């Protein structure tokens, strides 16, 4: 069985270069513009607040399209639409569920997540963690609107990261 951590090649292209603000480095964001006529509605995207979707994180690069955004489309069967600020509890929880996000996977260019990293997670996994009392904080402005098909806005608001 072959594991592919990235979407199919036609969409596996870099459309954003950015850095997630961290205490140990200067923050910057530079986005390479894609002409509007080439962007689908899901690429333009709205967040759960009905505003333009913001970037989630780029160190490490997150998102189904590995562009820093928690946007999704029908090829993303897991619906990686929830922008989380991962913590040790969630990393331990998801590892126990069979998805080890904290261990590096060099073959896929994945450094492993550390507490404080921003990462797009599956809406159903986040909801499962919520139901088990293990859900991490979320950045509402970076959670794609499709998340609301799985998780009520009130629940997300209750786990909003400070400043969100």
At which residue positions do the language-model features occur?
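Short, basic/aromatic beta-hairpin or loop at an interaction surface
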Residues: 86-100
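Glycine- and charge-enriched low-complexity intrinsically disordered segments
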Residues: 147-164
